[in-house]
Amino acid sequence: MAGATGIVTDIIGVVINAKFPEHETPEIYNALEIRLENGKRLVAEVQQQLGGGVVKAVAMSSTDGMRRGVKAIDTGRPIAVPVGPGTLGRVFDVLGDPIDGEGPVQTTEYRPIHRPPPALEDQSTTAQIFETGIKVIDLIAPFTRGGKTGIFGGAGVGKTVIIQELIANVAKEQSGYSVFAGVGERSREGNDLIHEMKEARIDEKTRVFDKTVMVFGQMNEPPGARLRVGLTAMTMAEYFRDEGRDVLLFIDNIFRFVQAGSEVSALLGRMPSQVGYQPTLGTEMGELQERITSTKKGSITSMQAVYVPADDYTDPAPATVFSHLDATITLERSIAAKGIYPAVDPLASTSRILDPNIVGEEHYRVAREVQRVLQRYKDLQDIIAILGVEELSDEDKLTVARARKIERFFSQPFTVAQQFTGRPGKYVPIGETVKSFARLLAGEVDHIPEQFFLLQGGLDDVIQAYEASRR
């Protein structure tokens, strides 16, 4: 009940017990507001009703300085965050408070972060390709407009760099709105991303940052904030979708959302499930993922980085995410070790829309032929390791040579990685990607050594580099 006042009776880490009059017990997910003695405001979200007017709530910020006996006020509604055009070009925390030092948000509309997904009759399910400008993704595992894509990989194989490149490409090439949720990742990376977005420009007047909303709940924050920051970003993205826009939602990293849920679950005293995860893992994931959908008004296309603990894809966290996705981009450490970036594994990455009826016969044929050549090369690895390449048949030698060129041609200079590669980023349209790989498979560039294919845009760039070296 709004305005009801209770007393904090227990503080266990970030979990707070508060006692209210029994007939005024706050509802589940209601926000409680607690004023600390130092003048700071602390918000906690009700998670359990224990009976007798006692509720258990999880704090969204540190409980340092809190003591038993302080007042807790029921706001009568869930955490509500600002939405609308005023949020563009701003940086927020889980409560929707700006953390960029740019003053208050210019908006009058606030929405609760707990909302039901759109009704089934309002949802739209058109299968349409979403161009990213990244060759290996567009060819092998094309994104679905209004779909969900997971970028899977262990530590340090390049998930965040791909996400950053996608944000830059979308803002420049498609002039869409982006919402970025930094869930439990490094504050330094978040800071770098903000500065890069401010420097990157769509044109002389517009920065990439001006078309982006950023919401952060970083590694150093309590689990409650990391668990709810995804919902805060989702609520802001839903506003733009409901206004008829196509929105991109980036979540880095969805595994940290699961990890935060596991911490909260343990603090609330729930019995852990397999590998120590929370028993409500599937439900929590579903509540977030089902809201990421397209309606007849607009679309939300989502890209989610998924950390894979110890490179184990059978771990319950990545396995639960898999079931919600339309496309999966798998990053492989062995490819990164060869210096090929993005380190996407074209044999393990999949997309629901790699179908001749959607992408076209030519695209489908080229993608499958590329995978066939790479698979044959993989099958021959043991023979090459034991006997050497010279013992292969002429046909297999040609397959190996083309496969090694394909592997290197899948690498690409990124705009956001210019300081590492020393090369300007390249955006390759999907039509050019398909034609380039078709020409490579047809043997047009069999005479060019494989090193010329590394970190190039289209096939014409490869030919130019080769001819320049011969002068």
Curated annotation (Swiss-Prot):
Q: Which InterPro entries match?
A: AAA+_ATPase (IPR003593), ATP-synt_VA_C (IPR055190), ATP_synth_F1_bsu (IPR005722), ATPase_a/bsu_AS (IPR020003), ATPase_alpha/beta_chains (IPR050053), ATPase_F1/V1/A1_a/bsu_N (IPR004100), ATPase_F1/V1/A1_a/bsu_N_sf (IPR036121), ATPase_F1/V1/A1_a/bsu_nucl-bd (IPR000194)
E.C. designation(s): 7.1.2.2
Q: How does it sit in the membrane?
A: Peripheral membrane protein
Alphabetical keyword list: ATP synthesis, ATP-binding, Cell membrane, CF(1), Hydrogen ion transport, Ion transport, Membrane, Nucleotide-binding, Translocase, Transport
Q: Which residues bind ATP?
A: 153-160
Q: Does the keyword Transport apply?
A: yes
Name the PROSITE patterns for this protein: ATPASE_ALPHA_BETA
| Compartments, as annotated in UniProt | Cell membrane
Q: Which PANTHER family match?
A: ATP SYNTHASE (PTHR15184), ATP SYNTHASE SUBUNIT BETA, MITOCHONDRIAL (PTHR15184:SF71)
Give the protein's function: Produces ATP from ADP in the presence of a proton gradient across the membrane. The catalytic sites are hosted primarily by the beta subunits.
**Name of the protein in its database record:** ATP synthase subunit beta
The gene is atpD
